[in-house]
Structure formats: structure tokens, C-alpha cells
Amino acid sequence: MNEENETSGEKLWTAEFIGLSATNFFHFMAQYVLIAGLPICIMNEMKGGELEAGLAMTFFQIGTVACRPFAGRLIDRLHKGRLLFGATLAFFILMLAFCFAHTEEELYALRLLHGIEFAVGTTAAATLAALVLPASKRGTGIGYFALSTNLAMVVGPLVGLLLVHFFGTLAMFVFLTISALFTLWIANRRKLPQKIVLPAEKEAGKSRFALVERQALPASLLGGLVFFAYGGLLTFIPLYAHSLGLEGSVSAFFAVFALVILATRPFIGSIFDKKGADYTVYPGFLLFFVGFLCFAAARTPVAFFFAAAVLGAGFGALSPAFQTLAVASVAPERAGLATATYFWSLDISVGFAAATLGLVAANFGYATLYGILCPAVIVIALLAYMRLSKGTVKKKKTA
């Protein structure tokens, strides 16, 4: 995006914010389309197996996790508008390249590069979105911005499966190429305030080499614990639903989950901005905790969907709250590194959940996973938040 010297006042739904939210949505939608469609492509057209299909996700995760902290440093040190343009251009080129990939090795290379671009593109969009928002509406705005990720999570797999099933994998790649071209346009069509896009002044000392924002670590780690529990939900729900004879309800589960987030997001963000984090975080922890207990006890479609609604309300309150706290913990010139630190924590947490919680499910069952372990993680996060909140209050009193 180009520069503009005038800001947009206290308005929330500016063209800049809408464009950045759309950029985030299409990045995440492409990822979820590929998560659903690439395994079918590899196994049916390239005659690979489950291992080869899984490697496509592994290479993407390697690129994302390895690049995320560097992305934050780049965003703070370089011209943010030009960096966003470069990332969205790379996004378009990579989606186009998928149309011409004919071997597993070519797909793996593209997925690795896609992971790197995804880390830069989503971190840049999230950082700029936080900076264009008025401070008085940051909680509400980041909540709506995060909603673009939630919607992509629901829409992406459905679109991917439908395209592959009815039109083939080439149609899926063509669709992603067109989406990426639209992203390139909408991300860069509007001008941004010059003070937002210009690089921060060079720092002295060790902080200029930091790849993690220490001030944002508490909120990032708390968000990581929430996403660790969410990762267990996201990864193993198809298997859990199958064990209950509810495999046909998985898509509807995520639809209910997303709809509840959509319905509650406006007033949750408003409460955060007007009354503070505690008024959304504590109810969010309670709802997320109860939601997992309901999920573990569900045996019918009605109970299954009720658990989805409660989990959606809890997750919808917690996720944007910790992202807002992470960004608010630093000066604007370090927002990129703070955002990258937050997302890096989420990347690692979801990946670690997929790698470890499967062992719990295999040895102790899904009732233990969802009824004991995930609620325990939520309790640990709650206790950590309470301790950190008390420490913050003490610092304010002694200041």
C-alpha cells in the first residue's frame, strides 16, 4: 500500500482495514483449501500415500515456523507497504505455480515457499490492521480481524473438497490463483498513513537483533496455551466424531463454532475496549473450560452442536483478547515483532498439539483428552493470567 498523510479518525470500518482483513482471509482460506485438497491430489493423481500427503503440511509448517520471527523483524525494519506488496505478489506467483506442479517434490518445494510467504503476509496484514485501528477501538477491530481467520477455517476446507470432487485439482489451483490476484489488488489499492508504513528508527544494543518481543511474550504464551487446546480439537475431531458415530456432523460442528464467534464478536470487542481485558478473558476461560467438558460428554448431535456453541463463545473471547494484549504491550514501531511473536507462539502450539495429543488419545482415549487434559491446560492458562494480572496491578501501584 502507498502512503497517505491523513489518518481515518476514529472510524473502524475504513477501506484500509477492510482490505487488510480481506488479505488475511484469502491467505488463510488458501491454506485451508490446500489442507483439504492437496492430500487428495497427492494420493489420487500422484499415487502417493498418507506419509507423502502429510509431508505437504509438514513443509508448510517448517517454512512458517522458521520464518515467523524474522518476518516480525522485517516488518519493523522495512517499509511495511512495500513489504506487503512483495508478500502478496509472491502469494499470487506461488498459487499460479501450483497449476504447473506435476511431482510431489515440486509440491513440497512450493509448500515450503508458501509457508515462508504465509508467515510474512499474514504478519504484515495483522500488524498494519492493528496500526490503522483507533486505539479506542483496537479490541473490537482486532476481534473482527481475527474473525477473517475463523471464517476462512470454515469456508476453506469446504471449497477445497467441493472443487476437487466436482472439477479436479487443477480447478482448485486456478481458483486459488484468481483469489491471490484479487488479494494482490485489494491489499495494495488503498493508501496508508506515512507514519504507519515507514520503518522504525534503528535500535541500539541487543534489542535490534531480537527475534522475539519480550514485552509481548506473556500474552503470546497465554494465547499459545489456548491454541494448544484448540489444536487438539481441530486435529482429532474427525476421529472423535467417527468413534461416536457422528462423522457426518463435523462440518456442521465447525459451522456452529464459527457462527457463534461471528454472533458474539461485536459485543465482546466492545466490552474489551470499554471495560478492559478481564471482562472478556475470565468469561472466555470459563466458557472454553465448560465447552470441553460438554464436548467430552457429547453422545448425540444436539449435545455435539451445543458443545460447539460453548467452545466457540469461549475461543471467540480469548483469541482476539490475547492478540490485542500482545500488540498493546509495545510501542507502535515494535508492533510487527509483537505480532510475529504472538503468531509464532500459536504456530508452535498447534503443531505441538498435533504431535503430542495423539499419543494421549491413543493411550487414554478421547474422553481423557477432551475431558481432562484440555480443561487442565485451560486452568493452567487461567492461573497464569491471574498471576500476570496481579503483577501488572502491583507495578501500576508502585509506579
Label the predicted regions.
Residues 112-148:
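Cytoplasmic helix-loop-helix junction between adjacent transmembrane helices
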